[in-house]
Curated annotation (Swiss-Prot):
It comes from Salmonella enteritidis PT4 (strain P125109). One of at least two accessory proteins for anaerobic nitric oxide (NO) reductase. Reduces the rubredoxin moiety of NO reductase. Its cofactor is FAD. The lineage of its organism: Bacteria, Pseudomonadati, Pseudomonadota, Gammaproteobacteria, Enterobacterales. Belongs to the FAD-dependent oxidoreductase family. Signal peptide: none annotated. This is Nitric oxide reductase FlRd-NAD(+) reductase. Its main location: cytoplasm.
Length: 377
């Protein structure tokens, strides 16, 4: 490969891919292009920065230059890719262009901000860069509204509460983690957050935000309003697909790829939060790690289809941590729940009596790996 491999992006997926490629080939030309600084940080740490009094710069693990030297790369930080000419195998920015043999899109996903009046007052915490932009406001804020009671919203609510802030957590659904599990399973976390002092506004929808002398007024569709100092959008992520569209490759929710992580164009691949693998968007660390292993082989001439085993998803709420696996969101499962003072085991059983999903908490999390082995997938 005389022109080599270009990777657009510098997050976890891009870095895992680089490491896996270099394990197999020390010399193939590798180029990374990204809009950020390309310094490495651990994104899950963003769920705990406030209680741990961390500044954005404290999250940096490795500078971009060190990474480039360690893995023999060409890096182009702070560079916006404007277009991809898939037929000519060329990536273009405003003032540069690069030729490639193979191209990998690792463009990640952007935080979704609800399209309401005053949406510009909402903050997002989806990157080190976003946290850097609002860290002073968040540290100084005493009253915080978090919009979205999913994985990230629940983690942030606990973290801000542990930091001594007055926290309101709002969601359209009737329970927390509603897209991941039924209310009878998430209720343990819900009760714990309430006991900590988090004010839950469930079955509630935000209508508008307005700047006031005292801070920000958040008005609900019900016309109930609350005064806060900061509002965080934790309403999910949207895969970044704009570049893929410009390149002419197939896009659905994410960039559509097959089991080989290949898009509809034979020399363009996608990995990480931007990828939709056989119809599934999997923005979790373990599938990204496995994707990087398989994609590295395939970029270097292999032909190995990605096989994803049953995997754990971790909810990083330190005072009541949860692990879950399987089809926890299925509505036709019968849940067997054992809840004791040291934790909970919830098993989602099919009509045929097969274990199709489970959620474990606290000290019962040590049973997760044994349950994984018996999970029907």
């Amino acid at each position: 490969m005389s022109r080599g491999i270009i990777i657009i992006g510098s997050g976890f997926a891009a870095r895992q891919l680089v490491k896996n490629i270099r394990k197999q080939d020390a010399h193939v030309p590798l180029t990374l292009i990204a809009a950020d600084s390309m310094d490495e940080y651990n994104k899950p740490d963003l769920s705990h920065v406030i209680s741990q009094s961390q500044r954005a710069d404290d999250l940096t693990r490795q500078l971009a230059g060190e990474f480039a030297e360690q893995f023999n790369l060409r890096l182009f930080p702070h560079t916006w890719v404007a277009d991809i000419d898939a037929d000519a195998h060329v990536v273009k920015s405003q003032d540069k262009q690069w030729q490639y043999d193979k191209l990998v899109l690792a463009t990640g996903a952007a935080a979704f901000v609800p399209p309401i009046a005053g949406r510009e007052l909402m903050l997002t915490l989806n990157s080190q860069q976003e946290y850097r932009a609002c860290e002073t406001q968040l540290r100084d804020a005493q009253r915080v509204l978090i919009v979205g009671g999913g994985l990230i919203g629940s983690e942030l609510a606990m973290d801000f509460c542990r930091a001594g802030k007055t926290v309101t957590l709002m969601d359209n659904a009737a329970s927390l983690l509603a897209s991941l599990m039924p209310p009878e399973v998430s209720s343990r976390l819900q009760h714990h957050l309430t006991d900590m002092g988090v004010h839950l506004l469930l079955k509630s929808q935000l209508q508008k935000l307005e700047k006031t002398e005292a801070g920000i007024r958040a008005t609900l569709v019900s016309q109930h309003s609350i005064e806060v100092d900061a509002v965080i959008a934790a309403t999910g992520l949207r895969p970044e697909t704009a570049l893929a569209r410009r390149a002419g490759v197939a896009v659905n929710r994410g960039v559509c790829v097959d089991s080989y992580l290949q898009t509809s164009h034979p020399d363009i691949y996608a990995i990480g939060d931007c990828a939709e693998i056989n119809g599934q968007v999997l923005p979790f660390l373990q599938p990204i790690q496995l994707s990087a292993m398989y994609l590295a082989k395939n970029l270097l001439g292999g032909n190995a289809p990605l096989k994803l085993p049953a995997m754990l998803v971790k909810v990083k709420t330190p005072e009541l941590p949860l692990h879950l696996a399987g089809e926890t969101q299925r509505s036709d499962l019968s849940w067997q729940i054992t809840a004791e003072s040291d934790g909970m085991i919830a098993k989602g059983m099919s009509g045929e009596g097969q274990l199709r999903a489970f959620v474990v908490s606290e000290d019962r999390m040590k049973e997760a790996f044994a349950l994984l082995k018996t999970l029907s997938v």
